[in-house]
């Protein structure tokens, strides 16, 4: 009784809070009838669960509120309220006979934190958050890592927590508390083992659920610059230019919008630069072709000019020969050939008169 009074002195003194905690009973609410598949999904225990009842599912999304006092008859069947109170080291129930208290005012805050943490620890269901078993393992790893950091920063709180755990496990009433304690010890060792073995395999992924958000946020913030560097160095200029838009969009899935826009602007710049270079190269090539054709045509024109000059000289030579031949066949040459011409009447009269006596002489 002295232990119970000492514990009662450290409990919250607000009557409204105590009345709310004691009167909060989920069994008085009507249960919505679900199809057989949903009911089978709700009553299926996830692998590695520490509780003997189904965890937080769409059918029971509201966690049962833990109670500092003895559990009500309605909530006694569920492991959410009674089991958590026994585990957290609250006021021992009637079956318990050992001391389950924590002395001193320094353990009050730690007791309340552990009380609510243990109450909500049973309602972390990966299936309710649409998570895979790998995400659940990552959440456990992040939770263990986070609690280890808190223990390193607050050694006094860690020592009080260990003392509180030892006393609560020693003074817990019934086999249920012992089973829960053993289960939690096994879960702690399992979490530590996974933290050491799977840390190198999952350090690139984000943690979901519970305190894993801290690790996930830090990893995401630290990897932003790495993503930017990897995205810039992932594709070369030739790959960006030659890759199709569909293939590029498929490769850019999972990156931030700013990085994708920056990479696409770089690709557009490279394509415009390549198009300008190709146009310039084509213009230079066409100019070279035209210049070569011009040189060929000019050489042909020179050859034709030389041919025209040669033909002109040959023409002049033939013309001169023709004129010479035509001059030899003139009037004097033709008369000696034996074709006499009749003299004109002016020349024929005296010649005939003079030639007649010569002819007769």
Swiss-Prot record:
Annotated bZIP domain ranges read: 262-325
Q: Which Pfam families does UniProt cross-reference here? A: bZIP_Maf, Maf_N
Residue stretches of biased makeup (Basic residues): 183-211
Q: Which residues carry this modification: Phosphothreonine?
A: 53, 57
| Database matches in SUPFAM superfamilies | A DNA-binding domain in eukaryotic transcription factors, Leucine zipper domain
InterPro entries according to UniProt = bZIP (IPR004827), bZIP_Maf (IPR004826), bZIP_sf (IPR046347), Maf_TF_N (IPR013592), TF_DNA-bd_sf (IPR008917), Transcription_factor_Maf_fam (IPR024874)
At the top level, the lineage of the source is Eukaryota
Q: Cross-link Glycyl lysine isopeptide (Lys-Gly) (interchain with G-Cter in SUMO2) maps to which residues of the chain?
A: 32
Q: What conditions trigger expression of this protein? A: Up-regulated by glucose in Langerhans islets (at protein level).
Name the CDD domains on file.
Answer: bZIP_Maf_large
Establish whether keyword Phosphoprotein is in the entry.
yes
Annotated stretches, region: Leucine-zipper: 290-311
Could you describe the post-translational modifications of this protein? Ubiquitinated, leading to its degradation by the proteasome. Phosphorylated at tyrosines.
What this chain does, per the record? Transcription factor that activates insulin gene expression. Acts synergistically with NEUROD1/BETA2 and PDX1. Binds the insulin enhancer C1/RIPE3b element. Binds to consensus TRE-type MARE 5'-TGCTGACTCAGCA-3' DNA sequence.
* Record-given protein name: Transcription factor MafA
The gene is: Mafa
């Amino acid at each position: 009784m002295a232990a119970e009074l000492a514990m009662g002195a450290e409990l919250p003194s607000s009557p409204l809070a105590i009345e709310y905690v004691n009167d909060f009973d989920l069994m008085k609410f009507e249960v919505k009838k679900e199809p057989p598949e949903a009911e089978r999904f709700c009553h299926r225990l996830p692998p590695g669960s520490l509780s003997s009842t189904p965890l937080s599912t769409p059918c029971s999304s509201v966690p049962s509120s833990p109670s500092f006092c003895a559990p009500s008859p309605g909530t006694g069947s569920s492991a959410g309220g009674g089991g958590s109170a026994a585990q957290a080291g609250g006021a021992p129930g009637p079956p318990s006979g050992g001391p389950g208290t924590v002395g001193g005012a320094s353990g009050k805050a730690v007791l309340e934190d552990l009380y609510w943490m243990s109450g909500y620890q049973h309602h972390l269901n990966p299936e309710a958050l649409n998570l895979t078993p790998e995400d659940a393992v990552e959440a456990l790893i992040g939770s263990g890592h986070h609690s280890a950091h808190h223990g390193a920063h607050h050694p006094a709180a860690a020592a009080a927590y260990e003392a509180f755990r030892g006393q609560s496990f020693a003074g817990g009433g019934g086999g249920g508390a012992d089973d829960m304690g053993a289960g939690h010890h096994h879960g702690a060792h399992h979490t530590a083992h996974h933290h050491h073995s799977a840390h190198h395999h999952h350090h690139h992924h984000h943690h979901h659920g519970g305190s894993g958000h801290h690790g996930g946020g830090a990893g995401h913030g630290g990897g932003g610059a790495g993503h930017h560097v990897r995205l810039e160095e992932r594709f070369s200029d030739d790959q960006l230019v030659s890759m199709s838009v569909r293939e590029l969009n498929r490769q850019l899935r999972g990156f931030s919008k700013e990085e994708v826009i920056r990479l696409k602007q770089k690709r557009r710049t490279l394509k415009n630069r390549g198009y300008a270079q190709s146009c310039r190269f084509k213009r230079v090539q066409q100019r070279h072709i035209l210049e070569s054709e011009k040189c060929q045509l000019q050489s042909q024109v020179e050859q034709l000019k030389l041919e025209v000059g040669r033909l002109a000289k040959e023409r002049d030579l033939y013309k001169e020969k023709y004129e010479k031949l035509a001059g030899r066949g003139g009037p004097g040459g033709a008369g000696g050939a034996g074709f006499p011409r009749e003299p004109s009447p002016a020349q024929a009269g005296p010649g005939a008169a003079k030639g007649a006596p010569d002819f007769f002489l």
